[in-house]
Structure formats: structure tokens, C-alpha cells
From Swiss-Prot:
Regions crossing the membrane: 483-503, 522-542, 551-571, 597-617, 654-674, 691-711, 720-740
Family according to the record: Belongs to the G-protein coupled receptor 3 family. GABA-B receptor subfamily.
Keywords tagged on the record: Cell membrane, Cell projection, Coiled coil, Disulfide bond, G-protein coupled receptor, Glycoprotein, Membrane, Phosphoprotein, Postsynaptic cell membrane, Receptor, Signal, Synapse, Transducer, Transmembrane, Transmembrane helix
Protein name per UniProt: Gamma-aminobutyric acid type B receptor subunit 2
Signal peptide start-end: 1-40
Organism: Rattus norvegicus (Rat)
Keyword Disulfide bond in record: yes
Notes concerning its domains: Alpha-helical parts of the C-terminal intracellular region mediate heterodimeric interaction with GABA-B receptor 1.
């Protein structure tokens, strides 16, 4: 409803009939109450003197009760009246006065546009336009102002679209736009160090524009918008997505009806409490949560659930009235103005825009005052009341004067920047079912003030802007590393003890026969394997990243070389035994330790080739594996993301496959040798049983260890414990199986290993070996074992010699009584000596030699020289040689020969070295002894 036109309007209507004349005073009174400014004064104000020319201002706003926003227009009128009254009292525009003419737009585009054109056509020349509440009506009128050279000042239009100065160059507003809250939000985010946010926007242009502007503001300040969600009717899906993206700080743009739905969804998703912070518009109606209707899709959201989800949210809105106790341009404080406003509105509902309307009237007055000063200073001699809609110059003067506005009003400092009010933004927080002001932002000074002890978070501190992910390196426990290192040191001490034992007793028969040099290599391999445990336990908690990467290569090399050294030496020993005892043709074969070292070196060379190629082509690198987040055991608002260091490369599977294949073939070869030599019954020489046990244990443990280690790669303590125990077990069991039996044997029964030297083979092997028992293999270990057998035979034969000496003395005494037997005994004696010497052939096969000796004695019982039965000899043929001189001559020749003839064949010395007599070796009877036998014995 437009205000009545002033005296400059067209001809008045015809006089009403007499009954209507009675109603005219009542009608005029009503019009004066509805639009007092149209007549140039406010209610209760004295009429200005007739000589005071008016400065007309067009007032456009909704006033009817049928329109929802009509309450805004009606609510600000008392404040407008106060401002006009105070301006007149101060004679700010003397000799002029403000003449505000109100026109009802009814928040309708057509009606609002008609009211504007009616004011232009039928009203006086208006200097400015005051008003603009509904965005649609305001934008239409503001877009056409430039053509009329009119400047518009709004007190309630907050839509961001009106900030476009290219489209609305003559539009100003005393109320901050909806976008004005974005710098305040930015300041709040910086204050609490929130660097990561998410947005939730209702699909309405007003909210979308604010969201878009906020995005630009935050982007320029390097604040991450991790997720942007929008919704039309059901916000639950968007809320769920925000939670899935770990958004803790939510910037919402929606109306109060949707706000209830949003918080119900937040309650269902548990997006409230100490971990979350909601920041939403603060311009909702007071106690809006009591007015909204919760939809059926949130049936479980009861009132207490809604209030629980709302607890702690922060609302952002412009400050309707300054809280500072400072006198304004009117000479009164904002608080004094508020009291006067409340007393003047007398039953009219309050409006949150009343302060901006009050300051707006003062802005118009100050602008016109400045324009008059500009006109007075110019040489045009133009009066301000001479303005018309085609006066572009005066329109520009008024426009420039508006831009220069700067004073302190009841809403704070009134300053325009590109037509936008640089006002004050307040922050309120929902606490215990009520909104409490907790701070304000001054846009002019760009400062944020948080009221002490008013803002309250549900936790002990402000929520984090995201789940704090504490990247925690999973490291090996120091106590575990210490325990396993202690076990490793004990293993190395044991290996050192075995090494000392092996070196000290290297000349002992038992140790010498078991290849002490190869034993040293076995110990060295075990110690290298032990040493790798220390390196496997060093991770990022002990060494730097660069050192760890170096350790990746070093520990791989040490473990690989240690394994090959230990088992390579063990298998080389077994191969020599296999080569000796599987030599079917029994050809002479010499396998020295140097050759075994070459074999072990060849195995190591293969290892080095693989490792060098691995390092050159695809070296091991330090990689960090990130696992899924875990809750903090201490219950803090953080999540722990375990990190684990690994030694990996691009083609890790291929390289491991090559190494495993090579080591597997080596173990299979060892198993084959151990199986082939299983029947060699020389404990000092044959370790096949222990090698088999070692291979079995090592193989099983390695397979189990590798599988469990792979399955526990995300648990470094378990993985290290398994790897270390497998290495300790394999190394310890291998060293113990090789050396403990020797140690026990050497300490308890040193000769046990050299007794019972019968070579036991399979039945087929026995038949073949019996046919080729005359061959000789001059290999050190075989020779050593045979030497032991010969020494045992030597001892037995020495005892036999002693018995023969006694028998010889008895025979000699008897021969002194029976000289005729001398010749026969002499012949028999030489025959017996020849038979005994021929037993040197038994050295080719000890078992065979023993058998020959036994058979020979059984078949020639006379060789036993039993003197108690002289009747078994032929008496008659020898009676002629038993004369005393024959006996004396025979004994002088036979005794040295009888005593020394056995010695060369049993390891003794040549008779020529101890007797001036002719050496028995010079006799033809000694020339049949095989040279190989002599070499074998003397060489040993």
C-alpha cells in the first residue's frame, strides 16, 4: 500500500458525498499512521515551518501484514522516526528537512515495480531511495536506478547478488550481506587453527552464492575444503559422506527448517560432541528449534536427540546492535537508542534490522549534507532541491558522497567498500538450549574478539579439524632385541668355543680325520649367520633412513654368505667321503683340503654373482608401508597409522626366487650326499647322519620361518623374533651336531673313533669291493683311517712278537737238546716269516687283511711255534743240523732277522738301522712288499 501523494500529484478526485466527508478525517489519520514520512514528519513530531523546503526520499518496503516480511518494514518504522526526529532537532540539513515517503512493495515484483514508477511519476523528485527488503524486488529496482540517477540505500537486503557493482552500481546497504560473514568465518577458523573444513549447502541460490564466495575466501588463505556437499530435501546422505571423508568442521548454509533435519541426521551419524564443530547461519528465529517440524525420515530424532546434536554449534550473523558503550553520531549510545526504540514501537513487533534502518537515515542525511557542501563549493550555484532524474552530475555527487560515509552508528562503524557495509559480525553458540554470544568480528579493523570464558566446547579443547593421524613407526621392542641379542651372543660364544676346540685339537686323530679346515668354515658360516641377527633388529628407531637402506643390503649378503659357507663346507666334506667310498674302480685319487676349499669358493662365487647382479640391477631400497588407522589406546582424539620399514625392490619376488632356488638345490645336494654315505661307519670321517639331521631341521625351520615371517610382516616384533629364533636354532643345531659328538668322544674315549674300522657298505658294494680290495687310494682321510687300523694291528702284532720271542727262546733251549731239528726249524721259520711279511697286502683292505692273517694262521698251525708238541715236526730230516755249532750260527743270523723283519710292514724301522747285520729289506723275501704300501705308511 503506497503512502498518499504529496501536493505535487495530479488533480484531486471529485469531492466525496456528504457521508464520506465524515470519514475523511479518520482516513487521513490512518494514512498518517501508516506512512508518516510521506508528509514530511514523524508521528508526534512538530510540523516543520512552511519555509523549510523538503528533501524527498523514496521509501520502498513491505508494510502489509499479509506478507511475511511486512513485519520488517513495520518493525523498523519506529527507528526511522527516531532518526528523522533527531536529525531535525540537530538541524543537520538546515534549511532543509527529510521528507520520507513510504511505498508498499508487498514483496511482489510487479507491485514493487509499480510502486517505484508511481513514485517517480506522481511524486516529487526524490533525491534517494531508502529501503529494499525482499531480494527479488530490490534487485529489479536496483538494476534500473542508474537510468534515473538515483542512489538506493537498503537496510535489510542481504542477498550476495546485489554486491555486483557492474550490475548494481547505485546500490548501497547498511546491513552486511550474507557474504560478509565469510571473512568472519575465516578469522574464526584461523583463531582455532582449523585448516580443514567441509561445506553442507541447501540447493537454494542464496546459500549457493554464499558457499561459492566462501570457497574463494578459504582457497586464498590455504584452508582445505575437503568435501563439498549439497542437498535439496534429505541431508542424511550428504552428512554421511562428510563423515566418511573425516570432516570435523562443517560449514553449513541452510534455513532453519532444514537445520532441524541436518542435526537429526548428524545425531544418527554421531557427528556431534567433542570431535565435531558445526558453524551455521545465525539469523534464524529465536528458539527456532521449537518451531520446526521434524520429518518422518528422522522419526528416531526426538527433541532431546535434536538438542544433543545441536549442542555447541556456532551461529554467524551480523550484529544488529553494537555492544560498545560509545556515543554514536546521534549523541546516544546504542543501548540508549535501544531503550528509546522499545518505548516508541508501542506494540509493534521488533525487527533485527531496526538499527540498520536507523543508521541508514543518518547515512542519507550525512550524504545529502556532503552533497550540499560539494554544490556550495562548486561554481554552479545549483541547489540540491533542484535535482531531477536526468541530472547526472548531481546523481554522481550523491553517489560519491555515499562512498565517503564514515561514522560510528548504533550498529558500529558505518563504512562502505564497493557499496558493501563493513559491519560487525557476531558469533553465538548454542549452550544448554539457548544461544549465547561468544564473540564478534569487526570488518573494518579485521579483528576477532572472543568473549572470555563464554565459548564452550564439549571436550577439554577445541575439536580437531580432522582425525589427527599419528604416524607411528612400528619398531622392534628394545627388551626383545636385547634378549635375542643376548642369545645370539651366547651362540657366538659357543661357536668361538668350538673354533678353539677345533684349532687346539686339529692334530688329534679324531679331529684331523674330520677335516679341521672345513670345520673352521662351518663355524665361520655359523658366526656370520649369528651376526646377521643384530642387523635384522636394527630399524628406524636405532639408525637413520640412509643407514637402514645400507643395512638392507649388508644383512642380506651376510646371511647368504654365512649359509653358503657353513653348508657348503659341510657338503664338501660329505662329497669327499662319497668320492672315496663310491670309487668302484678303486683308482688312486687324491682329494686334498685345497680342492674342498675351491668347491666352497665356487659356491660362494655363485652367491656373489647373484648378489652383485641384484645390487647392480635392482638394489634393495627402504620402503615404508602404511597400514590402516587404529584408535589410540590411551583414548585420545587421535588415530594411529602404523608405519613399517621394509627392504624391498621392484622385482623382489624374482630375486628371492633365484636365491631360494639356489639354496634349495644346495640342500638337496647335501641330502643326496648324506644318503649316499649313510653306511660309512667311521664316526670320525663320516658326518652324514648329522648332516642329514641338520638339513632336515634347517629345511623345516626355514620353510616355517619364511611362511610365518611373511604372514606377520605387519608385526615387526613377531617377525624379528621368528627370524632370529630360526637363525639361532639352525646355526646352533648345525654346530652342535657337527662338534658335540666329537667333543664328547674326545673327552670320554679318544680311541673309540679309531676302533672297529670295518667298512660297511651295502651287499652289492661288498661284493664289488672284495674284488678290488688290492687297490690303494692315497687320500688323506682314507689313509688316516687306515693308519689307525694299521697302528691297532701293529699293537697286536707287537704282542704277538713278544709271544713269538718267548716261543723262540723255548725252541732254542729245546734245540740245544735236539740239534737234528735245527735245519727244519730254520726252514720253517723263514717260511713263516715270508708268510707274515706277505700280509702287508692287507693294508689295501683292513678287513681283508685280517681275514687273510686269520686264515693263514688257521691253515698253518705250525706257525704258532708251539714247543710243547715237537712231535708234529719231522724229526728225522733235521737231526743232523742240531749240532751246537749249527745252532749257534743259526741264532746269530735268525734273531736279528726275526726281531726286525716284521717292523717295516707294521710301521717299525728297518733292521739295518739298528743292527750291523744285513738288512732284511735287502733280502729277496722283502722285495715283494708293495711300494704303495710303503708310501702309504711312511707318508702317514
Amino acid at each position: 500500500m503506497a503512502s498518499p501523494p504529496s501536493s505535487g500529484q495530479p488533480r484531486p478526485p471529485p469531492p466525496p458525498p456528504p457521508p464520506a466527508r465524515l470519514l475523511l478525517p479518520l482516513l487521513l489519520s490512518l494514512l498518517l499512521w501508516l506512512a508518516p514520512g510521506a508528509w514530511g514528519w514523524t508521528r508526534g513530531a512538530p510540523r516543520p515551518p512552511p519555509s523549510s523546503p523538503p528533501l524527498s526520499i523514496m521509501g520502498l518496503m513491505p508494510l502489509t501484514k499479509e506478507v511475511a516480511k511486512g513485519s520488517i518494514g513495520r518493525g523498523v518504522l519506529p527507528a526511522v522516526e527516531l532518526a528523522i526526529e533527531q536529525i531535525r532537532n540537530e538541524s543537520l540539513l538546515r534549511p532543509y528537512f527529510l521528507d520520507l515517503r513510504l511505498y508498499d512493495t508487498e514483496c511482489d515484483n510487479a507491485k514493487g515495480l509499480k510502486a517505484f514508477y508511481d513514485a517517480i511519476k506522481y511524486g516529487p523528485n526524490h533525491l534517494m531511495v531508502f529501503g529494499g527488503v525482499c531480494p527479488s524486488v530490490t534487485s529489479i529496482i536496483a538494476e534500473s536506478l542508474q537510468g534515473w540517477n538515483l542512489v538506493q540505500l537498503s537496510f535489510a537486503a542481504t542477498t550476495p547478488v546485489l554486491a555486483d557493482k557492474k550490475k548494481y552500481p547505485y546500490f548501497f546497504r547498511t546491513v552486511p550481506s550474507d557474504n560478509a560473514v565469510n571473512p568472519a568465518i575465516l578469522k574464526l577458523l584461523k583463531h582455532f587453527r582449523w585448516r580443514r573444513v567441509g561445506t553442507l549447502t541447501q540447493d537454494v541460490q542464496r546459500f549457493s552464492e554464499v558457499r561459492n564466495d566462501l570457497t574463494g575466501v578459504l582457497y586464498g588463505e590455504d584452508i582445505e575444503i575437503s568435501d563439498t556437499e549439497s542437498f535439496s530435501n534429505d541431508p542424511c546422505t550428504s552428512v554421511k559422506k562428510l563423515k566418511g571423508n573425516d570432516v570435523r568442521i562443517i560449514l553449513g548454509q541452510f534455513d532453519q527448517n532444514m537445520a532441524a533435519k541436518v542435526f537429526c541426521c548428524a545425531f544418527e551419524e554421531s557427528m556431534f560432541g567433542s570431535k565435531y564443530q558445526w558453524i551455521i547461519p545465525g539469523w534464524y528465529e529465536p528458539a527456532w528449534w521449537e518451531q520446526v517440524h521434524v520429518e518422518a525420515n528422522s522419526s528416531r530424532c526426538l527433541r532431546r536427540s535434536l538438542l544433543a546434536a545441536m549442542e555447541g554449534y556456532i551461529g554467524v550473523d551480523f550484529e544488529p546492535l553494537s555492544s560498545k558503550q560509545i556515543k554514536t553520531i546521534s549523541g546516544k549510545t546504542p543501548q540508549q537508542f535501544e531503550r528509546e526504540y522499545n518505548s516508541k514501537r508501542s506494540g509493534v513487533g521488533p525487527s533485527k534490522f531496526h538499527g540498520y534502518a536507523y543508521d541508514g537515515i543518518w547515512v542519507i542525511a550525512k550524504t545529502l549534507q556532503r552533497a550540499m557542501e560539494t554544490l556550495h563549493a562548486s561554481s554552479r550555484h545549483q541547489r540540491i532541491q533542484d535535482f531531477n532524474y536526468t541530472d547526472h552530475t548531481l546523481g554522481k555527487i550523491i553517489l560519491n558522497a555515499m562512498n565517503e560515509t564514515n561514522f560510528f552508528g548504533v550498529t558500529g562503524q558505518v563504512v562502505f567498500r564497493n557499496g558493501e557495509r563493513m559491519g560487525t559480525i557476531k558469533f553465538t553458540q548454542f549452550q544448554d538450549s539457548r544461544e549465547v554470544k561468544v564473540g564478534e568480528y569487526n570488518a573494518v579493523a579485521d579483528t576477532l574478539e572472543i568473549i572470555n570464558d563464554t565459548i564452550r566446547f564439549q571436550g577439554s579443547e577445541p575439536p580437531k579439524d580432522k582425525t589427527i593421524i599419528l604416524e607411528q613407526l612400528r619398531k622392534i621392542s628394545l627388551p626383545l632385541y636385547s634378549i635375542l641379542s643376548a642369545l645370539t651372543i651366547l651362540g657366538m660364544i659357543m661357536a668361538s668355543a668350538f673354533l678353539f676346540f677345533n684349532i687346539k685339537n686339529r692334530n688329534q686323530k679324531l679331529i684331523k680325520m674330520s677335516s679341521p679346515y672345513m670345520n673352521n668354515l662351518i663355524i665361520l658360516g655359523g658366526m656370520l649367520s649369528y651376526a646377521s641377527i643384530f642387523l635384522f633388529g636394527l630399524d628406524g628407531s636405532f639408525v637413520s633412513e640412509k643407514t637402514f637402506e645400507t643395512l638392507c643390503t649388508v644383512r642380506t649378503w651376510i646371511l647368504t654368505v654365512g649359509y653358503t659357507t657353513a653348508f657348503g663346507a659341510m657338503f664338501a666334506k660329505t662329497w669327499r667321503v662319497h668320492a672315496i667310498f663310491k670309487n668302484v674302480k678303486m683308482k688312486k685319487k687324491i682329494i686334498k683340503d685345497q680342492k674342498l676349499l675351491v668347491i666352497v669358493g665356487g659356491m660362494l662365487l655363485i652367491d656373489l654373482c647373484i648378489l652383485i647382479c641384484w645390487q647392480a640391477v635392482d638394489p634393495l631400497r627402504r620402503t615404508v608401508e602404511r597400514y590402516s588407522m587404529e584408535p589410540d589406546p590411551a583414548g585420545r582424539d587421535i588415530s594411529i597409522r602404523p608405519l613399517l620399514e621394509h627392504c624391498e625392490n621392484t622385482h623382489m619376488t624374482i630375486w628371492l626366487g633365484i636365491v631360494y632356488a639356489y639354496k634349495g638345490l644346495l640342500m638337496l645336494f647335501g641330502c643326496f650326499l648324506a644318503w649316499e654315505t649313510r653306511n660309512v661307519s667311521i664316526p670320525a670321517l663320516n658326518d652324514s647322519k648329522y648332516i642329514g639331521m641338520s638339513v632336515y631341521n634347517v629345511g623345516i625351520m626355514c620353510i616355517i620361518g619364511a611362511a610365518v615371517s611373511f604372514l606377520t610382516r605387519d608385526q615387526p616384533n613377531v617377525q624379528f623374533c621368528i627370524v632370529a629364533l630360526v637363525i639361532i636354532f639352525c646355526s646352533t643345531i648345525t654346530l652342535c651336531l657337527v662338534f658335540v659328538p666329537k667333543l664328547i668322544t674326545l673327552r670320554t674315549n679318544p680311541d673309540a673313533a679309531t676302533q672297529n674300522r670295518r667298512f660297511q657298505f651295502t651287499q652289492n658294494q661288498k661284493k664289488e669291493d672284495s674284488k678290488t680290495s688290492t687297490s690303494v687310494t692315497s687320500v688323506n682321510q682314507a689313509s688316516t683311517s687306515r693308519l689307525e687300523g694299521l697302528q691297532s694291528e701293529n699293537h697286536r702284532l707287537r704282542m704277538k712278537i713278544t709271544e713269538l720271542d718267548k716261543d723262540l727262546e723255548e725252541v732254542t733251549m729245546q734245540l740245544q737238546d735236539t740239534p737234528e731239528k735245527t735245519t727244519y726249524i730254520k726252514q720253517n721259520h723263514y717260511q713263516e716269516l715270508n708268510d707274515i711279511l706277505s700280509l702287508g697286502n692287507f693294508t689295501e683292505s683292513t678287513d681283508g687283511g685280517k681275514a687273510i692273517l686269520k686264515n693263514h694262521l688257521d691253515q698253518n698251525p705250525q706257525l704258532q711255534w708251539n714247543t710243547t708238541e715237537p712231535s708234529r715236526t719231522c724229526k728225522d730230516p733235521i737231526e743232523d743240523i742240531n749240532s751246537p755249532e749249527h745252532i749257534q750260527r743259526r741264532l746269530s743270523l735268525q734273531l736279528p732277522i726275526l726281531h726286525h723283519a716284521y717292523l717295516p710292514s707294521i710301521g717299525g724301522v728297518d733292521a739295518s738301522c739298528v743292527s750291523p747285520c744285513v738288512s732284511p729289506t735287502a733280502s729277496p723275501r722283502h722285495r715283494h712288499v708293495p711300494p704303495s704300501f710303503r708310501v702309504m705308511v711312511s707318508g702317514l
